[in-house]
Every structure is written in structure tokens, then in C-alpha cells.
């Protein structure tokens, strides 16, 4: 009765844990009677109605029974802070004392029967106290519940004798809503918890290590003992499942329905009898028993309490909220029932479900106050309990005898069942630990191996964290979380005393070693602190961001290898906070891994791009190198081929054959080419150079002619040499290729040698770039072979008119006066005494001296040994190696050469001289002339690139005229006749200045209109780089008959030469047409080509009439040469 009164006081809020202990002591006197009544209480159908009321009232004790588990976790103080010690007393009073007394008798019996059962009985007797005291901490409360079940089962026999349960129980449940809920939840949750437990055991069966909590074994043994007792009591033994279920329901409804539910479920689902485990556990149990007793005396040192506090601190945090607020006490207890059930069942799903329920209820904090027990209900409960206790005292004696017998039977059955189930329980406990295996974690847990050598770890928080005080395990945020989450909003704004004030004084748990839960505000999720620095080594750690070092090589390994989980003891189950932290860590870890992989992939892509770019660059460079190499090889091959061709040309070119003429003993003979002199050139002109088998010009020998043929011909004999040269058949050999500048001027003029310093002499002249025509004539004459006699020259095969393709570039033929009868194509030339005209002509020549494009490849080697330049003749006549083009348009008249300034006397004296020029051109030349006249204007724009004058001019200093041998040519008012003897007489240096004996027998290029442009486009009348030969005017008849081509040729006749009767009368002077030679381009009128045969004539010295009147009477054309002003009659 005292115990009932104490319970009533506690229900009102004034009782303490000591009261509960006193109550437990009384109950210990009543021992099994009390527990026997408990059995039917949870399941009224199984128990009598009279016992139920008393048992329920005694067990529940008003609020005492409900607060058994919460009181330990801080819920014992449900409505007042003065209930500090109620937790301890509640846990201890019922279970410990009752079990200890009840187990005394069975202990002896067991000792007598078997040796193995002796420690079991002791453990069952003493251990439930330790279990209730320390084991209350454990949420996997199978152990405690089974202990209480043992007591309950002890009184199962007396179930029928209980007659008051319905009234008291009915009033109790009607007044106390939470008891009914607790009972229902406990009974309902027992089954799913059992299922989950069974699944967990099944899964983790292989992985469970032998190490387990000693308290669990002992509690399980006690549980089986208690279960075995009630089985026999009702008469028909209930199956173990029923037995377990009934005590579970009892306990769930009474004290901790959740624990009982879990225990019953675990036993109900897996009643595996494992005798081996039981036998092994017995010595351990005895040792544990001592430790448990020590735990009662000195709770802080109780290893079971420490372990449970570490394992299930999160639930403590939940209950602390209830106990602190007082409002949510009932809700928290109910929630804790579900939590403990889920924890006991061991399923993570159940754990989560319980957590969710608790979370929902926690947010309900303020509203749960209406569910608190009123004082009236507590008073009613006290009265009922007193009545029940009286009845129990009467029945205790009867029950004791029956219980002893039941205990003996149960001990045997229980050990079989317990051993198997205990192993399963241990397997489950370790299954959660195996889910998060600890590899090498120095957590400081000091394991105490029991004598059974199964390696059960006894965890001591003081030893586990030797370097930390009990208060250092929680962060400030976590400390606030314990006391703070008591406001309706769930925030930490309350100053209610913290949980550490009175949470675990009796059990020595002044400070919990587990992190408390927050109020789902999420504020403290990332502020956890663990003494083992496991968070620092977690994947989100700085040193683990991109250096995962194989510990978590696989993406899913971190789930199985998270250090925050390993910080818990082996049997612990993860709390919600730990799970959230784990999830957060995993998210962070995966995010970092993803970023790492993205960075690696980006680096790989970048490296690949660089490699591709390098490959492309290398490919392009190699391709460029190959292309350049191929080009270089091609160029080398081309140059090699050119060199080979040049070598071949040089090899094929025959050696020069020298023919010594009798008149010139040292005259150098020219090559007597196989092609006869009678061969007619296709261009109407013949080559004056020795014929060679190669048509390519040879300009490579740059030595002066005099040096090349030193000693062969003296200056004294130059005239003789020239005569021999003219008499030579090869001198004017009609070779078309030679006419196209195939030969070198040195061949034609071998004795020519420019002075050593000709440029200084020329610099003194103002007409540096041009040479006076008289000077050119004299120089040409001195450099050419004059015929010894007209007969000899006529007998020779040379056709002078056609055989001068390469004359030295010389004078500017600026014809100032051109009169054409009836044609009108050339304007009348005004008087050539205008200084402006002279200036214009001089400026025109200054525009350019030579055509750069054409001379670039030839000027270097052309002018080195042959310093002659083109001044007045067209570009297509004067440039070597260039195919002839149509002549440009007629230049303006009134052009004078600068050489006039140096030869004014010549201009005065020779102004009246007439040019007797008969030009009978072949049909091809006539057609060319006609086309050139008509197309001259058009062609000028085509190929006059720089300037029309630049095509004919040449750089200054190229006229290095040597002091040629001079031929004495008398000049007078009458006809000037040159006797052959005069050709050999030397004359004064000054004589050649005034020597205007004859117009050089140059075949001017004339295109006769009336022909198609293609007839004689490439016909060349005369090369421009050879000097005009000086001498008497010849009628150089081409030897057409010898070449098989009888075509009209050019005829140069004296103005008044009646002796030239060999020319047919048809070619009379009356038919002569004026020819205008503008800038070296003769402009002939349309000549009617009357067919005739030119007979070979004796070329006699022409009569040059220097008088103007006579020239006007006898000549139809007055041609004024700017440099020599020579007028003559053109005779056809």
C-alpha cells in the first residue's frame, strides 16, 4: 500500500524516483504477484476481470507506469521539475525488486536441476534490476521488457483470480486517454515491429558478430524466463508467440509498451532455440550480473547504462523535450512508444516511421497539453491500485508456489528459445553496425571481453572520451536544442531548464554522449561536433574534395563506410540527426564528386582539344613542309633541267671556224654555216651573224670582242676585216633564227672592242643616251667589212638588205619631215626649228630608257659585254629573245635627237641630202605594213606598258662607241662617189664626224597594207642592236634566185643614177611614194606590188646629192633624220 501511495504522489507530480523504488520494494515483497497481474493486464481476454484493475493500477501507478521509459529519458518529470529521481525509482521498483525476490526460489531449483541454469537464474533475479536501472536507457528494450515479462509471467497463474480489472481498468482508460493509446500502439506496433525485427535478423544473421551487449543477453534470458512462466499459468500453455505477445501487450499498455512490443515481437517472430549460445552466455551472464549490480550502486559506472545512453541518446533527446515542456509529455511518450518499438524492432523503416511520427507530434508541442492526466484520474488510479495491492497480497502466497514451478520449466524452455532469439537480436544489433562498418576507428571505446570470449563490448563513456568532459560532447547549438525546443513554434527561444539538470543523475548520465535532435528547424544540422573528428575525415572534408584516396573509391561505398555512423557503438542504431547528417554528407560528397568528375572531364576535353590542335598544327606544318620541299625539289629540278639544257646547247654548238681572207691576213673568219647565204629569212631579213646549229642566242660570253680575238685584227686592218666580213658568205646568212637575234653581235663584229673607259667620254656629251647618226654610220662602217668592189660584193652571196637582223642599238631615227602624196596618214611635218619640239622629243626619251619587263632577264648579260642600247628602233626590233609584236602607233613628228646638239654642222650640211631608198617588200611585208598602219593605234595601248618611248629608249651610258676605223668619205656639193680605193685609206678622226656618205643599207620594217594581219606579224626588218653599216649606197639585192625564192627586195639607189638600168622600167621614179619614218618606224604608202624580177646588179657607190633643190626635183620623199637630216629619193 505504501508503494501505491507513493505512486499516487508521483502521479500528482510530487513523487520522485525514490518513491518508485519504495514502491518497487513493496512490490518486491509481493514479487511475482505484481508481475503476474501484469500479464493479463495488457491482454484483458487472457486475464480475469478482477485482477486486471488491481494489476493495471499497480503497474501504471497513475502516471508512474507510463513514465517508466520517458522518466529515464527525461520524461519522468512530466509536469514538474521536482520529479528528478522518478525515472530511476520507476525502473527499479517494479522490475528489480520483484524479479530479484521471485528468482530466489527458481534459482535453487535451477541449480538442482542443471548447472547451466544457475547463473541464468541469478542473472534473471538480479539482472532485471540492472536492466530496469541501466537498461531503461536502451531503446532496444527487448531486454528490459523481457525482464518485466518474466515478472509478469510469474504471476500468470493468478490471472483468473483478478476480479476488479474491468472497473478500474475501464475508469483508468476512460480517464487516461494516453494509456489507451499507449496500449493500442504497443499492441499494434508489436506485430510490425516483430516483422521488421525478423527481417532485420534474417538479413543480418550472417553478419552478426559474436560481440553483443551483455545486458541484452541477460535481459533476453530473463525475458524467456518470464515468458515461460505465464505459459503454464493459464492452464493451456500458450504458444511462445502468444506468451510473448501477451506480456508484450501488458507491458506496452503499462510501462513501456513499445519496449515490450519489440521484445515480444523479437521473441514471437524468431523463437530459435540455440542452446550453444545460451551455454556460452551463462558465464558471461554471471559476470554481467555483478557489473549490473555495481551499476545499480554506482550508475555512472554501469556499462549497460553507458552503452545505452550512447546508443539511444536521440530518443533521450525526444523524451527530454516532453519532460521539459510538460505539454508534450503525453505525446512524446506515445511517440517514444512508437520510437522504442521501431528501435527495438530494428528496422530502419520503423525507425524512420517512428521518427516521423515523433516529428509530427513534436511540432504539436503546445497542443499536447490537453492530453495530460488530470489529478482526478491520478487519484482514481491510486485508489484502484490500493485495492489491487490488497488483493494481490492475498494471492501472492498461492502464486509463489506456482511461479517457482513455472520458472523451472520456463528456464529450460527459455534458454533454448532465448539463445536462438538472443543471437538473432544480437545479429540485428550488429546488423545496423555492419551497415556502417568501422574499419580502423580509434574511437576510444574500451571493450571488455566477457569470460564467454564472445567479445561483447561494454562501453564506458568516460573511457570512450577520456579527453573530453561530459559536457564537451555537445555543441552550443546542441545544448540549446536540449532545453530550447519547448516553444510552440519549435524554436530555441525558451529558458526552460535543460535536460542535463536531471536527465540521468541516477544512472550517471549527467550528459548524453549522443547528439540531440533539433526541432526540425534545420539550424543545427551542420553544427555537430564529434570528438573523434570523424566529420573532418568525411567526404565533404577539404582534404577529401578531390583526393578520395581509395577509401571511398566507389560512389556507393561512402554509404557503407561513413565515419559519422562508425562513431556510434556497435549496437547503436542511427538517429535521425545522424541520418540527416549522413544524407547531407552524401549529397555534398556526390556533388563534389560530380564537380570533380566534371572538372576532370573538362580537363580531359581541354587536353584532347589541345592534342587535336597540336595534331592539326603538326599536320599543317608537315604538309607545309612537304609542299615547300616539293616546291624546292621542283625548282631544283627545273634549274637542273635548265642547266642541263644549257650544257647541251653549249655542247651542240659547233666551234667557230675561222676563214682567213687574203686581203686581211689577220682577219677573223666567221663560221661558214651549212646554211648558204642564199637562204632567205622568213622575216625578209637575213642574219649577219655566223650560223650555228642552235637557234638559241648565245649571250653568255661577255668578254669584249677585242679581247676574245686579241691579235686577230688590228685597228689598222679593221676596214679590211670589215670588207672580208662583208665578203663572207656567212656574214649576211639568211637564217631566220639568226635573224631573230640568234647570234651574238660579237660574231658579226668580232673586232669590235669598246674602250676601257667609254662612259667618262660619253658623260661629257649631252646626248649621252643617243648617238648622232653620222657617228653611228662612221662607227658602223669602221666596224663592218666594206666590199672591196661592187662586183665582188655583187658576186658575193650576201644580201645586205636582208642580212642585217642584228644591228647595234644606236641612233634615234626621229623623222621630222614626212610628206606622203595623197595618203594623208601623216601630217605634214612643220619646220624643224622649234625648240619646244626639240624639248618634247628630249623629254619623251627621258620617260624611260628601256622596257623593264622585257630587259629584266637580259639586260645584265646583254649590256655587260655589249654596251649598246636601243634608242630609236621599236621594242620588238631591239629586244633580244622577245617575240616581235605589231609596231606601235606612229609617234608625233618633230622629234629630234639630242645628238643634234653635238653635230650642228652635220645638221646644216646634211639637211639637203636625200635618201634614195627603194623598198620593195614581199607580199608578207606589205601585208604587215598595211596592218601596222591600220592597227597601230590599237596596238599602242596593248603593249606600250610604260610609255611608247620607254620601249625604245635605253639606259644612259650604254653607247660606248669605240674610235672605229674611219673611211675617208669626201663631202661636197656634187655627187659624192666613193671609190673602192678610198675604203682602204685611213682618214682623219674628224672626217667621220661630217661623213654623211650614205644612208645605211638598213631594211626598214614596213607593213604594206592590203594583207591579213597574220601574214607577216613576226617579220623583222632589222634588229635594233646592230650599228648601221657605213659605206656607199648599195642596192643590196637578196639572192632570191639562189635560195629558190624570187621575191621583190629592197633596193637602195642613188638619187640620180642613170646607170642603174638593170632595174626594169616599170619601177620608175614617178611611182615612188613618200615614206615617213617616225621614230624608227617607216611609214610607206600603199605600194602597188607589180611583179618583177630583180636582176642582180652591180652595186655602185650611190650618188648623194646634197643639194636641196636637186633632192626636191628628183625625190618624191623628203625624209629628215633628226640626227643626220638625210634626204633621199626612194626608187622603186
Curated annotation (Swiss-Prot):
Biased composition (Basic and acidic residues): 24-35, 195-208, 218-229, 281-290
Keywords: Acetylation, Cell membrane, Cytoplasm, Lipid-binding, Membrane, Nucleus, Wnt signaling pathway
Comp. bias regions, Low complexity: 121-133
Pfam families with a match to the protein in the record: AMER (PF09422)
InterPro entries in alphabetical order: AMER (IPR019003)
Region entry Disordered, spans: 1-256, 268-301, 338-423, 469-505, 674-699, 736-770, 924-949, 1038-1132
GO BP terms: adipose tissue development; bone development; kidney development; mesenchymal cell differentiation involved in kidney development; negative regulation of canonical Wnt signaling pathway; positive regulation of canonical Wnt signaling pathway; positive regulation of protein catabolic process; positive regulation of protein ubiquitination
Tissue and organ distribution: Expressed in kidney.
Top-level taxon of the source organism: Eukaryota
Membrane topology per record: Peripheral membrane protein
Entry function: Regulator of the canonical Wnt signaling pathway. Acts by specifically binding phosphatidylinositol 4,5-bisphosphate (PtdIns(4,5)P2), translocating to the cell membrane and interacting with key regulators of the canonical Wnt signaling pathway, such as components of the beta-catenin destruction complex. Acts both as a positive and negative regulator of the Wnt signaling pathway, depending on the context: acts as a positive regulator by promoting LRP6 phosphorylation.
Subunit structure: Interacts with CTNNB1, AXIN1, LRP6, KEAP1, APC and BTRC. Interacts with SCF (SKP1-CUL1-F-box protein) E3 ubiquitin-protein ligase complexes containing BTRC and/or FBXW11. Identified in the beta-catenin destruction complex containing CTNNB1, APC, AXIN1 and AXIN2. Interacts with WT1.
Name of protein: APC membrane recruitment protein 1
